[in-house]
Amino acid sequence: MEWTDIFSGPAFEPVKSRELHLGKDCDLSRPLVVRDTDKLTVEVAGGAALRLVVLHTKPCQAEIRIKLLEGADAELVQLFSAEAFVDFQVEQAAGSKFRMTACQFTSANVRYRFDLNGREASNELDVLFLALEQDHCVVDLRTNHLVPDCTSRSLIKGVASGTGRGEFCGLVYVAPDAQHTDAQQQCRNILLSRTSRIDARPQLEIYADDVRRWGRWRMKRSSICVSAV
Protein backbone atom coordinates (compact mmCIF):
# COMPACT_ATOMS: atom_id res chain seq x y z
CA MET A 1 0.00 0.00 0.00
CA GLU A 2 1.35 3.39 -1.01
CA TRP A 3 1.00 6.28 1.42
CA THR A 4 -0.95 8.21 -1.23
CA ASP A 5 -3.66 5.53 -1.06
CA ILE A 6 -4.80 7.19 2.15
CA PHE A 7 -6.41 9.87 0.00
CA SER A 8 -8.48 7.27 -1.85
CA GLY A 9 -10.37 6.42 1.33
CA PRO A 10 -13.89 7.44 2.36
CA ALA A 11 -12.65 10.53 4.21
CA PHE A 12 -11.88 12.28 0.90
CA GLU A 13 -13.82 13.22 -2.23
CA PRO A 14 -11.97 12.53 -5.53
CA VAL A 15 -12.27 15.14 -8.27
CA LYS A 16 -11.42 14.62 -11.95
CA SER A 17 -12.63 17.93 -13.35
CA ARG A 18 -10.16 20.58 -14.48
CA GLU A 19 -12.45 23.37 -13.25
CA LEU A 20 -13.98 23.86 -9.81
CA HIS A 21 -16.44 26.59 -8.82
CA LEU A 22 -17.51 26.75 -5.19
CA GLY A 23 -20.56 28.89 -4.42
CA LYS A 24 -21.26 30.35 -1.00
CA ASP A 25 -23.93 27.70 -0.35
CA CYS A 26 -21.63 24.81 -1.29
CA ASP A 27 -21.40 22.30 1.57
CA LEU A 28 -18.21 20.22 1.46
CA SER A 29 -18.29 17.58 4.17
CA ARG A 30 -15.05 15.99 2.91
CA PRO A 31 -11.81 17.48 1.54
CA LEU A 32 -11.48 17.31 -2.23
CA VAL A 33 -8.59 15.38 -3.81
CA VAL A 34 -7.10 16.12 -7.23
CA ARG A 35 -4.52 13.62 -8.48
CA ASP A 36 -1.92 14.13 -11.23
CA THR A 37 -3.63 17.02 -12.98
CA ASP A 38 -1.90 18.97 -15.73
CA LYS A 39 -4.27 21.93 -15.41
CA LEU A 40 -6.61 23.04 -12.65
CA THR A 41 -8.69 26.21 -12.25
CA VAL A 42 -10.53 26.90 -9.00
CA GLU A 43 -12.82 29.79 -8.02
CA VAL A 44 -14.14 30.13 -4.47
CA ALA A 45 -17.05 32.49 -3.79
CA GLY A 46 -17.34 34.74 -0.77
CA GLY A 47 -18.45 32.83 2.31
CA ALA A 48 -17.39 29.48 0.85
CA ALA A 49 -14.58 27.34 2.27
CA LEU A 50 -12.36 25.11 0.14
CA ARG A 51 -10.39 22.15 1.49
CA LEU A 52 -8.26 20.61 -1.24
CA VAL A 53 -5.45 18.05 -1.53
CA VAL A 54 -3.33 18.11 -4.70
CA LEU A 55 -1.25 14.99 -5.35
CA HIS A 56 1.61 14.70 -7.83
CA THR A 57 2.36 10.97 -8.07
CA LYS A 58 3.51 10.85 -11.71
CA PRO A 59 6.05 12.94 -13.65
CA CYS A 60 4.19 15.88 -15.14
CA GLN A 61 3.97 19.57 -15.93
CA ALA A 62 1.02 21.31 -14.30
CA GLU A 63 -0.64 24.70 -14.16
CA ILE A 64 -2.83 25.52 -11.17
CA ARG A 65 -4.87 28.71 -10.79
CA ILE A 66 -6.92 29.60 -7.72
CA LYS A 67 -9.11 32.69 -7.34
CA LEU A 68 -10.56 33.64 -3.97
CA LEU A 69 -13.41 36.14 -4.08
CA GLU A 70 -14.18 38.55 -1.24
CA GLY A 71 -14.44 36.72 2.08
CA ALA A 72 -13.53 33.30 0.64
CA ASP A 73 -11.48 30.76 2.59
CA ALA A 74 -9.14 28.08 1.24
CA GLU A 75 -6.92 25.46 2.85
CA LEU A 76 -4.69 23.32 0.62
CA VAL A 77 -2.21 20.47 0.91
CA GLN A 78 0.16 19.74 -1.99
CA LEU A 79 2.24 16.54 -1.99
CA PHE A 80 4.94 15.39 -4.42
CA SER A 81 6.01 11.74 -4.72
CA ALA A 82 7.16 12.09 -8.35
CA GLU A 83 9.08 14.72 -10.26
CA ALA A 84 6.84 17.57 -11.36
CA PHE A 85 7.10 21.08 -12.76
CA VAL A 86 4.25 23.20 -11.41
CA ASP A 87 3.17 26.79 -11.96
CA PHE A 88 0.90 27.70 -9.03
CA GLN A 89 -0.90 31.06 -8.83
CA VAL A 90 -3.41 32.47 -6.36
CA GLU A 91 -5.42 35.70 -6.58
CA GLN A 92 -7.02 36.97 -3.38
CA ALA A 93 -9.79 39.53 -2.98
CA ALA A 94 -10.56 41.52 0.17
CA GLY A 95 -10.92 39.56 3.39
CA SER A 96 -9.99 36.22 1.82
CA LYS A 97 -7.84 33.69 3.63
CA PHE A 98 -5.43 31.22 2.03
CA ARG A 99 -3.41 28.57 3.88
CA MET A 100 -1.23 25.94 2.26
CA THR A 101 1.19 23.17 3.21
CA ALA A 102 3.40 21.63 0.52
CA CYS A 103 5.85 18.71 0.78
CA GLN A 104 8.36 17.66 -1.87
CA PHE A 105 9.52 14.10 -1.18
CA THR A 106 11.49 13.91 -4.43
CA SER A 107 12.79 16.20 -7.17
CA ALA A 108 10.31 18.94 -8.05
CA ASN A 109 10.28 22.46 -9.42
CA VAL A 110 7.45 24.69 -8.22
CA ARG A 111 6.76 28.34 -8.89
CA TYR A 112 4.35 30.00 -6.46
CA ARG A 113 2.85 33.42 -7.10
CA PHE A 114 0.41 35.02 -4.67
CA ASP A 115 -1.38 38.28 -5.49
CA LEU A 116 -3.06 39.99 -2.54
CA ASN A 117 -5.47 42.28 -4.37
CA GLY A 118 -7.94 43.22 -1.62
CA ARG A 119 -7.63 44.73 1.85
CA GLU A 120 -7.26 42.40 4.84
CA ALA A 121 -6.42 39.40 2.71
CA SER A 122 -4.14 36.89 4.46
CA ASN A 123 -1.78 34.30 3.01
CA GLU A 124 0.15 31.51 4.75
CA LEU A 125 2.53 29.04 3.11
CA ASP A 126 4.56 26.21 4.67
CA VAL A 127 6.88 24.18 2.44
CA LEU A 128 9.13 21.21 3.22
CA PHE A 129 11.47 19.74 0.61
CA LEU A 130 13.71 16.67 0.89
CA ALA A 131 16.58 16.70 -1.63
CA LEU A 132 17.97 13.22 -0.97
CA GLU A 133 20.80 11.49 -2.86
CA GLN A 134 20.63 13.07 -6.35
CA ASP A 135 17.32 14.90 -6.00
CA HIS A 136 16.95 18.53 -7.05
CA CYS A 137 14.17 20.51 -5.35
CA VAL A 138 13.26 24.06 -6.37
CA VAL A 139 10.87 26.47 -4.65
CA ASP A 140 10.37 29.83 -6.39
CA LEU A 141 8.05 32.11 -4.41
CA ARG A 142 6.73 35.60 -5.10
CA THR A 143 4.21 37.26 -2.77
CA ASN A 144 2.74 40.52 -4.06
CA HIS A 145 1.19 42.93 -1.56
CA LEU A 146 -0.72 45.23 -3.89
CA VAL A 147 -3.12 46.97 -1.47
CA PRO A 148 -2.98 48.10 2.20
CA ASP A 149 -3.69 46.05 5.33
CA CYS A 150 -2.72 42.57 4.11
CA THR A 151 -0.64 39.90 5.83
CA SER A 152 1.56 37.10 4.53
CA ARG A 153 3.70 34.45 6.21
CA SER A 154 5.93 31.91 4.48
CA LEU A 155 8.13 29.25 6.08
CA ILE A 156 10.38 27.13 3.86
CA LYS A 157 12.32 24.20 5.32
CA GLY A 158 14.76 22.06 3.38
CA VAL A 159 16.86 18.95 3.97
CA ALA A 160 19.60 17.76 1.59
CA SER A 161 21.80 14.65 1.68
CA GLY A 162 24.19 12.83 -0.65
CA THR A 163 24.62 15.06 -3.68
CA GLY A 164 21.11 16.43 -3.33
CA ARG A 165 20.49 20.06 -4.11
CA GLY A 166 17.77 22.46 -3.00
CA GLU A 167 16.96 25.96 -4.18
CA PHE A 168 14.72 28.60 -2.64
CA CYS A 169 14.12 32.01 -4.18
CA GLY A 170 11.57 34.11 -2.32
CA LEU A 171 10.49 37.66 -3.11
CA VAL A 172 8.10 39.78 -1.05
CA TYR A 173 6.90 42.75 -3.11
CA VAL A 174 5.09 45.66 -1.45
CA ALA A 175 3.48 48.17 -3.81
CA PRO A 176 3.72 51.95 -3.16
CA ASP A 177 0.17 52.19 -1.76
CA ALA A 178 0.26 48.94 0.24
CA GLN A 179 0.58 50.58 3.66
CA HIS A 180 0.27 48.57 6.91
CA THR A 181 1.59 45.45 5.23
CA ASP A 182 2.70 42.65 7.57
CA ALA A 183 5.02 40.28 5.69
CA GLN A 184 7.08 37.47 7.20
CA GLN A 185 9.42 35.10 5.38
CA GLN A 186 11.69 32.40 6.80
CA CYS A 187 13.93 29.75 5.28
CA ARG A 188 15.62 27.08 7.43
CA ASN A 189 17.75 24.29 5.99
CA ILE A 190 19.81 21.29 7.07
CA LEU A 191 22.67 19.71 5.11
CA LEU A 192 23.35 16.06 5.96
CA SER A 193 26.52 15.63 3.87
CA ARG A 194 29.45 17.71 2.68
CA THR A 195 28.41 17.22 -0.93
CA SER A 196 24.81 18.37 -0.50
CA ARG A 197 23.83 21.95 -1.20
CA ILE A 198 20.94 24.33 -0.60
CA ASP A 199 20.86 27.85 -2.04
CA ALA A 200 18.54 30.34 -0.31
CA ARG A 201 17.84 33.74 -1.84
CA PRO A 202 15.21 35.66 0.16
CA GLN A 203 14.44 39.11 -1.23
CA LEU A 204 12.40 42.19 -0.27
CA GLU A 205 11.16 44.85 -2.68
CA ILE A 206 9.32 47.52 -0.70
CA TYR A 207 7.91 50.83 -1.93
CA ALA A 208 5.55 51.65 0.96
CA ASP A 209 6.54 53.50 4.15
CA ASP A 210 4.46 51.81 6.85
CA VAL A 211 5.44 48.15 6.60
CA ARG A 212 6.15 45.47 9.14
CA ARG A 213 8.56 42.94 7.68
CA TRP A 214 10.63 40.11 9.08
CA GLY A 215 12.97 37.71 7.33
CA ARG A 216 15.34 34.98 8.44
CA TRP A 217 17.38 32.26 6.88
CA ARG A 218 19.31 29.52 8.61
CA MET A 219 21.65 26.81 7.37
CA LYS A 220 22.86 23.94 9.51
CA ARG A 221 25.56 21.42 8.62
CA SER A 222 26.41 18.90 11.32
CA SER A 223 27.01 20.97 14.48
CA ILE A 224 27.67 24.26 12.70
CA CYS A 225 24.82 26.76 12.56
CA VAL A 226 24.85 30.12 10.83
CA SER A 227 21.91 32.50 10.95
CA ALA A 228 21.14 36.01 9.80
CA VAL A 229 18.24 38.34 10.45
Regions found by a protein language model. Name each.
Residues 13-228:
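Conserved beta-strand/loop scaffold segments within soluble protein domains that form the structured core
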Residues 2-6, 11:
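C-terminal functional modules
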